A protein has these predicted regions:
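Membrane-helix interfacial "entry" motifs
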Residues: 30, 53, 77-82, 113, ...
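Transmembrane alpha-helix interface motif
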Residues: 1-58, 64-69, 179-269
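Short helix-capping/hinge motifs at transmembrane helix termini and TM-loop junctions
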Residues: 56, 75-76, 104-105, 268-269
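Juxtamembrane/interface alpha-helical elements of multi-pass membrane proteins
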Residues: 83-201
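Structural signal for the C-terminal ends of transmembrane alpha-helices
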Residues: 72-78, 146-148, 266-267
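Short alpha-helical basic/polar micro-motif
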Residues: 80, 174, 227
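Alpha-helical transmembrane segments and their membrane-interface exit regions
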Residues: 67-77, 91-96
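Membrane-helix interface segments
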Residues: 58, 78-79, 161-164
């Protein structure tokens, strides 16, 4: 583990906190989604994600992706942020999974690579899979970026999601941040005590020790997080300062979400 690795790891943890702060900042913007009741956002975006998964036509899924981009612009979400954090990652991950479909799906061959043929049906299948993932992840990211996490949990609880699920989601969110903070402090401490460049054998020993200590701390941290939440009165019901009341605009937006989702499912059959 060389100094450059320690520095890059510490910078990576810093970027994780920066992205978290970006989500909180975006949620405070005055935009389309931010102006809606959190319950409407959860139900509406979930309806659009469901429509994406049920649609079987590339044109319909592509149209939903355009809708997602328009919603992002109207909600003051950076397109560069979406491209960097969502689209490129989803494209790389899904592309690896969809690549074999180009060759193994039976259909009319349009090109040949030796004894393997690329089929038209295979290209359509791969394109549909990639578009579905890109669009669904975009809608989900918009929900996370435009809604504080506590509001998401309260909206899910208002929609009768079991308390056990709310507790798991709340604990996971807090646990991940505390674990990242602990790991960041460990690497920062190690970097401040490292002089010069370690040999490969020393790098491996240090990496193993750091991973072992972090694992042991993670077990203790999980208990501490749960006990801290319990001591502060958390029982699965999320409390926020704002009082939610559905307005006429919320009902219109909810109707628009459901209508768009239903129309997409009907057109994508």
């Amino acid at each position: 583990m060389s100094r450059s690795f320690l520095e890059s790891t510490t910078v990576g943890f810093g970027r994780a906190f920066t992205r978290a702060m970006l989500s909180e900042t975006t949620a405070q913007q005055r935009g389309l989604l931010q102006s809606l009741d959190p319950r409407v956002r959860v139900v509406g975006l979930f309806a659009l994600v469901l429509a994406v998964e049920l649609s079987r036509k590339i044109a319909v899924v592509a149209a939903l992706l355009v809708v997602a981009v328009v919603m992002a612009v109207a909600s003051r979400v950076s397109i560069f942020t979406l491209a960097k954090r969502v689209w490129l990652i989803a494209l790389g991950f899904t592309g690896v999974i969809a690549l074999p479909a180009i060759f193994v799906t039976p259909g009319r061959p349009i090109a040949a690579l030796g004894t393997v043929a690329i089929t038209e049906q295979g290209l359509r299948t791969a394109a549909l899979l990639v578009l579905r993932v890109e669009t669904a992840v975009t809608f989900t990211t918009l929900l996370v970026l435009c809604t504080p996490w506590s509001h998401v949990l309260k909206a899910l609880r208002a929609l009768r999601l079991p308390k056990e699920a709310i507790v798991m989601l709340a604990m996971t969110y807090r646990y991940v941040f505390l674990l990242v903070e602990t790991a960041s402090q460990m690497f920062e401490s190690r970097r401040s005590r490292t002089v010069g460049v370690l040999k490969p054998q020393g790098q491996r020993r240090m990496a193993a020790r750091t991973a072992g200590v972090l694992l042991s701390k993670s077990f203790a941290l999980s208990d501490n997080v749960y006990l801290a939440m319990q001591s502060r009165g958390f029982r699965g019901d999320v409390q926020v300062l704002s009082d939610w009341r559905l307005t006429m605009w919320d009902f219109i937006a909810l109707f628009g979400f459901l209508l768009a989702g239903s129309f997409a499912v009907w057109m994508g059959r």
